[in-house]
C-alpha cells in the first residue's frame, strides 16, 4: 500500500512538472535555481545543473555502462508561477548544506507533528525556505512564515 502511494505521489509530481514545462524556458529555470541556491544552498551554486522535464536536476557523474539508471542526479525543484519551488529530494540529499534549518530532536513532539503533515513552531529557522532536521539528519523541507514552519513533507510519506 505504501509503495502504491509513493508511485502515485511520484506520478502526480511528474504530471505537474510536465504541465508546467511549457511555462518557463530552461534559461529562466536555471536562473531561478541559481537565485534560490544562492540564498539557501550557497555550496550548490557552482554545481552544474540541467533542466529536464520542466524541472532542475543536479546530475551526478555516472560511468557509461549497460545498467539501467533510474535517476542519475537529484531533482531539486521547478519554477511555478515565476518562483523556484524546491523538491523534497533537495532537502534530503543536501539538507546539511542548507543555510536555514529548523532543528528538531527525536524526543521533540514537533517531530511527530511534522511527520504527520502539520505546521510546527519555528524556533531555529528564519523566514523563507528551510530544511527540517532531526538530530542533524535532514528530514524534509518547509517554508517559515510568521514563526511557523509550513509543512512541505510529501503526503505519501506522512504518518497517519
What kind of feature is each model-predicted range?
Residues 3-160:
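Polybasic, low-complexity RNA-engagement segments
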Amino acid at each position: 500500500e505504501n509503495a502504491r502511494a509513493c508511485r502515485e505521489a511520484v506520478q502526480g509530481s511528474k504530471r505537474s512538472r510536465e504541465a508546467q514545462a511549457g511555462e518557463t524556458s530552461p534559461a529562466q529555470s536555471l536562473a531561478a535555481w541559481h537565485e534560490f541556491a544562492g540564498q539557501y544552498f550557497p555550496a550548490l551554486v557552482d554545481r552544474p545543473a540541467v533542466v529536464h522535464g520542466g524541472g532542475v536536476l543536479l546530475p551526478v557523474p555516472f560511468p557509461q555502462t549497460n545498467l539501467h539508471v533510474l535517476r542519475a542526479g537529484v531533482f531539486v525543484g521547478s519554477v511555478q508561477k515565476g518562483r523556484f519551488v524546491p523538491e523534497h529530494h533537495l532537502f534530503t540529499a543536501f539538507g546539511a548544506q542548507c543555510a536555514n534549518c529548523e532543528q528538531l530532536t527525536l524526543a521533540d513532539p514537533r517531530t511527530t507533528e511534522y511527520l504527520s503533515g502539520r505546521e510546527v513552531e519555528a524556533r531555529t529557522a528564519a523566514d523563507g525556505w528551510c530544511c527540517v532536521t532531526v538530530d542533524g539528519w535532514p528530514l524534509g523541507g518547509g517554508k517559515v512564515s510568521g514563526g511557523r514552519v509550513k509543512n512541505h513533507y510529501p503526503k505519501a510519506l506522512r504518518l497517519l
